[in-house]
């Protein structure tokens, strides 16, 4: 009731919110992608392992899947980069979760390709996540694949479309990563003249 003299409102409530019964209710699972390790993984779960989790969740009647952040956390190229909430980009995904075979195959004479099966078996057998070994190999693999395939993918219509749709963040993200690697830190305050991004 409204007290007209004191111009105040008194609210009486039992403390319970009443919702319509039609609201969605569902059980789910929260999981970091690196925990979805399969025999096809490379020491950690990756993006290609997610469909199997989705199939399992549907089979057991779960309605929701929540992942720990998937964003790039590689700010120092050290073990500190393992923290999922220390993202350096709101858009860039963490290379830790790359599925190397889905990216493309290196030539058979490439040293990384020769090591792949043995390295994969060792990393998958480890009871721990060998973060530095995994991310180091994945960066090296991606870099080698880039130089092997750059003429092909730079002219690929799917790549061109992706770049055009995402260049609003992709160019500045690539510049950030290049400067991070050049200066050895993601702290842009230590980049001297490059501390302020200039789109021009």
Language-model-detected regions and their locations in the chain:
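Acidic/aromatic-lined carbohydrate-recognition and catalytic surfaces
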Residues: 14-200
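Short beta-strand elements
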Residues: 2-18
């Amino acid at each position: 009731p409204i007290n007209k003299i004191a111009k105040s409102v008194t609210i009486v409530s039992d403390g319970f919110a009443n919702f319509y019964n039609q609201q969605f209710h569902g059980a789910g699972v929260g999981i970091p992608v690196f925990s979805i390790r399969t025999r096809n993984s490379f020491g950690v779960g990756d993006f290609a392992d997610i469909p199997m989790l989705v199939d399992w969740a549907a089979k057991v009647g779960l309605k929701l899947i929540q992942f720990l952040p998937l964003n790039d956390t590689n700010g120092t190229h050290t073990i500190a980069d393992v923290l999922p909430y220390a993202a350096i980009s709101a858009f860039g995904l963490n290379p830790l979760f790359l599925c190397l075979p889905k990216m493309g195959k290196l030539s058979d004479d490439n040293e990384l390709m020769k090591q792949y099966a043995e390295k994969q078996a060792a990393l998958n057998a480890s009871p721990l996540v060998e973060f530095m070994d995994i991310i180091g190999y994945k960066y090296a693999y991606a870099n080698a694949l880039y130089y092997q395939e750059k003429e092909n993918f730079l002219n690929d219509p799917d790549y061109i479309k992706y770049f055009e749709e995402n260049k609003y963040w992709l160019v500045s993200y690539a510049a950030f990563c290049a400067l991070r690697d050049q200066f050895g830190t993601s702290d842009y305050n230590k980049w001297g003249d490059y501390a302020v991004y200039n789109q021009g």
